[in-house]
Amino acid sequence: DHEHLSFQKINGPVLPFEDATFDVVTSLMSFRYLDWDPLLAEIKRVMKPGGKFLIIDMVTVPVAISEYPRLLKDKMRTKRDQKANAQFDAALQKLVSHPDWKKMLEYNPIRSEHEMKWYLESRFPGQKMETLNMAWNSRIVAFDSGPVEKGIEVKLSYP
């Protein structure tokens, strides 16, 4: 418990907060499952001017041969982290092997890297998605919107 931190469960894209409430809005491993345009409009509504939107999520993309050194390094780090955090790793494995998790993935597949990258980088010009960890067919990525000012809207449709 922390007096300046709270977690909220929401249903649908409407966020139950006043306009300009937050300095930072985060999405951890969930943005890929949501309807991006309505949610992003709500996130911008609840952010204070100059606020940031931070995302850590998973995308799907096969590893290229030129990326094998990075893949090996990330695999070794992941194995080391799993050993160091065995209790967390066991809980994670239990979660992702649960039938409800598998059913959820059936209806909400992981987004492709190029789709999420295009979406975020086109709506926050000058900002870049970054790979945190690489696996054979997926990556953990991070995105920092940078300071977001009110009234700046990039209206685009997916090509």
Regions found by a protein language model. Give the residues of each.
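Short alpha-helix
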Residues: 106-128
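A conserved beta-strand element that flanks and buttresses the S-adenosyl-L-methionine
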Residues: 26
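A short glycine-rich, Lys/Arg-flanked "PGG" loop and its adjoining helix->strand segment in the class I
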Residues: 37-49
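Conserved SAM-binding strand-loop segment of SAM-dependent methyltransferases
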Residues: 2-18
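Short, glycine-/aromatic-enriched active-site segment of Class I SAM-dependent methyltransferases
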Residues: 93-106
